[in-house]
C-alpha cells in the first residue's frame, strides 16, 4: 500500500475541532415503593374505622357515666371555640390535610386506590372527602382525654409517620415536576406526623402520671378567663402626659413601625384555635407555593441554558437580531442573558416569600388588636362602622371556611406576586442595569433623553406651584394661616391649567401602579379590605374575616366564659356549704380565726363577683347575647352599646338593676 493510500485512511484529525460531548439529561423512571400506596390505604382505612368504633363506644360509656344524653362527642373532634385547649393536635392534622391537598392536585391519580386517568375530576371530588375522613381519627383520639384514645392515637400516628418515611426513603426521586419535588413537598407532612407521634405518647405519659386533665369541659374551669377579667378590672396606673407638643423622633417612629410587624405573646391573651390553625397552614402554604414555583420553572431554564448552541445565532438572525458576528460570542451572550433571567426569577420568588412572611406577621398583630378591641365593644374602630356582634347565617358560613380561605388567598396571592415581581425585576435588569454596565441597548435612556423638555416642564411646573404656595400664597399671622395674594393665586392656577392636565396624566398612571402593587402585596391578607370603606362588603376576603370575628367574640368572650365558670364554681360551692351545715349539726365547730378568714374571703369573692357581673352587663359586645335585647334595632346601638336616648332605654336600666340586685343578694348571702 502506497503512502498516499495510507494518508487517505488517516483519521487522526477528525476530532481536533469537535465540540465537547454534553452530558445526557437524567431521566427519572417511575418509582413504586416497597410499601404499596394502594395496599397501605386499604389497611389504614380499615384500622381507622376500627379505631373510630372503639372511640365511639368509649364516648358512649363516658356520657352514660356522666348522665349525659345526645350524640357522641366524636361528632365534634375538637372545640374550635375553646381558647384554653392544646392546639398542637388540631394544627398538625390540618397541616397534614393541606399537604395531601397539594399532592393530590398535582398528582395524576388523586385516589391511591385507582390508577385510572380518564375520570380524574370525579376521583378528585372523592379524594377531597376521603382524606379528611382518613385523618379524622388522628384528631378524634385526643377528644375524650382518655388513655385508650392516646394509645390509639400513638399507634395511628406512628403508622402514618413510619409508612411515609419508608416510602420517601425507597423513592427519593420521582418524575413529577422535579426529581426531588415529592421529597421536599412531603417535609411539612413528615414534620406534622412526627409531632403527632411525639405528642400522643406525651399525653399518655401525663395521663398515667395524673397530670393531664381528663375533663372535656375544662374550658370554663380554666384560669385563663379569670386572669383576663382580673387584668381588665385592675386599676391602671396614671400615665404621665408630657406637656411638650414635639413630634416623635425618626428613630422612635422607625422602632414603633418595626414593633408593629413583630408579634410578641401576652400572658393574658391566647389566640383562638381557628386563628392558630390558619397561621400554621398559611406558613405551610407559603412553603409549598415557593417550592412549586422554584421546582416548576428553574429546571426548565437550566435545560434551556444547557441546550444553547451555535444554531441560536441563525435563529436570532431570522428575526433580524445580530448580537455578534462570532457565533461563539452569541452563545455566550445568550447563556448570560438566560442566567440573568434565572436570577430575576429567583429574586422574584424570594421577594414574594419575604413580603408574605411580613404580611403574616403583621396580620397576627392585627388579629390580637381586633379581638381585644371587640372584647371591649369597640366595633367602630375595628369595622369602621356600627355592627352588632351576634351570630348569623353568613357569619357562620364564613367562620367555617376562614382557615381554608386564608390558605387559598395566600397561594393565589403568592403566584400573582411572583409574576408581577418577575416582570418588574426583568425590566429593571434588561432595560436599566445591563445597559448601564455594558453601555449598549440604551433604548430606554434614549427615549427619556428625547423627552427631556417635556419632563423638565412638568418638574418645573410642580416645583413652581410648591414654592409659590410655600412663600407667596400662605400667610402666617398670630399662629394662624390664611391665603395671601389671591389674585396671583388665581392667575397662576389658570396659566398652569394645561400643564396640570399633563401632570394629572402622569399621576393617574402612578396611581394605577401604586394601587395595583398595594392590592397585589396585600392579596393574601384577610384582615384588611382592598376596597373603599363604603364598598367593603364586596371584598369577599375582608367580609369573611369580619364575620369570623363576630362568631369568635360572641361565642368565646373571656368575660362571658369567666362568668359561666363562676356559676359552675358557685354550684359546686353550694354542695360544700350543705356539707358544712351537716358537719355543724353534728357538733363540728371551726376555729374563730378560720371564721374571720372565711368572712374576708367571702367579701372579696362577692366584690369580685359584683365587678364581673357589672362588666358582663355593660360590655357592648355582649349586649346581643341577652334575650330581651334581641329585638333591639340597629339604630338603638352606638358602637355596639345600647343608646341611652333610645325608647328602650328603660329596658337597659332595668337589666342593669336586676343583675345588681342579684349581685347584692349574692354578696349578702356570702
Curated annotation (Swiss-Prot):
Region Disordered, residue ranges: 640-670
Topological domain ranges for the Cytoplasmic compartment: 60-87, 143-145, 204-274, 368-401, 474-488, 527-670
Xref: Pfam families: RBP_receptor
Compositional bias segments (type: Basic and acidic residues): 645-664
TM ranges: 39-59, 88-108, 122-142, 146-166, 183-203, 275-295, 347-367, 402-422, 453-473
Chain ranges inside the bilayer that never cross it: 489-526
GO cellular component, one term: plasma membrane
Location relative to the cell: Cell membrane
Membrane topology field: Multi-pass membrane protein
Chief subcellular location: membrane
Segments on the Extracellular face: 1-38, 109-121, 167-182, 296-346, 423-452
Molecular function (Gene Ontology), one example: identical protein binding
Keyword set, alphabetical order: Calmodulin-binding, Cell membrane, Membrane, Receptor, Retinol-binding, Transmembrane, Transmembrane helix, Transport, Vitamin A
Electron transport recorded as keyword: no
Effect of inactivating the gene: Morpholino knockdown causes severe defects in embryonic development, with microphthalmia, a curved body axis and heart edema. The morphant hearts do not loop normally, heart atria are strongly dilated and blood circulation is severely impaired. Morphants have an altered morphology of the craniofacial skeleton, with malformation of the first and second arches and absence of the branchial arches. Embryonic heads at 4 dpf display reduced total retinyl ester levels and reduced levels of the visual pigment 11-cis-retinal.
GO BP terms in the entry: chordate embryonic development; retinol transport; vitamin A import into cell
Region of interest (Interaction with calmodulin), residue spans: 600-626
Record-linked InterPro entries: STRA6-like
Free-text note on domains in this protein's UniProt record: Contrary to predictions, contains nine transmembrane helices, with an extracellular N-terminus and a cytoplasmic C-terminus. Besides, contains one long helix that dips into the membrane and then runs more or less parallel to the membrane surface.
Main function: Retinol transporter. Accepts retinol from the extracellular retinol-binding protein rbp4, mediates retinol transport across the cell membrane, and then transmits retinol to the cytoplasmic retinol-binding protein rbp1. Required for normal vitamin A homeostasis.
Subunit structure of this chain's protein: Homodimer. Interacts (via C-terminus) with calmodulin.
Name under which the protein is recorded: Receptor for retinol uptake stra6
Organism the protein comes from: Danio rerio
Organism taxonomic ancestry: Eukaryota, Metazoa, Chordata, Craniata, Vertebrata
